[in-house]
Amino acid sequence: MAKLVEPNAVEVFEMIDAALKYDPSVTKGKEGVYEFHLKGDDGGTFQMIIDEEGPRAIQGTEKEPQCTLEMNTDVFRSLVAGTLNPTSAFMGGKLKVKGNMGLALKLQTVLNSFSF
């Protein structure tokens, strides 16, 4: 049986960007700049920006982050897939949050709206 290939972090952020543009209503009331520091082979710095220009997800840094999340890429993929609860990841030390904790809590509902 062939093993499924998981998307790398760049591909996941491309999917998030497409989903945000397809249905920007999921970001209403969640305006902010979220920065992700992902560790691992396919890690890097990514941002999810929700502002007057419209929601988007990018590789790199475009704006000053208001909320920074640090984790391994496998933890990130599990969060996006919905197989890991963000609160459990935070309490278990798998997810570190700096900055606006309120934004981090709002992010969970955005991530939960995706189905990939």
Can you say where each PLM-predicted feature lies in the sequence?
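Feature captures hydrophobic
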Residues: 1-116
